C-alpha cells in the first residue's frame, strides 16, 4: 500500500466549510437516515465514561459496509470549561477506511456535530414543510443556532426569519451576525420582542434550547 493511502488528513472547521455546503449536508443526512432505516449500517449504542470534574467522555461509532467506511465521534462534556472560556463540548470525528482499517481523516467534531444536527432539521423542513414558505422563526441563540438557521434558509427560500432569546443583547448581536454571515440567502434576520412575536405567522419554526418548559404556546 502506498504512503498516500495510509496518510491521515486533519480537517479544521474552515477546511470542512470549504468543501461541503448545508444543502450538501441535508442530502447526506437524508441518505444516512435511509441507511439506518434500511438496516445497512451498524450503529452501536454510544459508550459513556464519567470522569472527574463533572466531565464525561462519549464514544459514538458507526460502520457502513456499502461505503467501505467506519467512523467514530468522540465528544467530551465538561460544563465547567465555560469558566475558563473553553468549549464545554469539544469533539473530534475519526473517519476509517473500511477496507484497511486505517484512519484516513480526523475532523473538527464540534463543527461536524453542528452541521449534521442543523442538516437534520433541514431534511425535516425539506420533506415535511410547505413548499411555499416566506417566514421562519427560531427560538434560542446557543451553539447550535447558526447551523439550524442556515438549514432553514437552505431548505426554503425565506424572506424573513425572526429570532428570539431570553438574553436580549445576545439575540440582537446574533441576528446582526447572521444577517452578514447568511447574506447569500437573501433573507432578513430580525430579533423578536418575545416568543409569541417570534412565531407569529411563521411557516417554519425551530427551537434551539434545552428548556424543560414550553418556550411558546401554539
Residue spans of the language-model regions?
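NAD(P)-binding Rossmann-fold cofactor-contacting core
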Residues: 155-182
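Short helix-loop-beta connector
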Residues: 128-135, 157
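Rossmann-like adenosine-cofactor binding region
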Residues: 184-218
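Glycine-rich Rossmann-fold phosphate-binding loop(s) that bind the pyrophosphate
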Residues: 141-142
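N-terminal ligand-binding/catalytic initiation module
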Residues: 1-114, 122, 132
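Aromatic pocket-lining residues of Rossmann-like dinucleotide-binding sites
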Residues: 152
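N-terminal Rossmann-fold NAD(P) dinucleotide-binding loop
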Residues: 145-146
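A structural signal for isolated positions on well-ordered beta-strands in alpha/beta enzyme cores
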Residues: 137, 161-162, 190
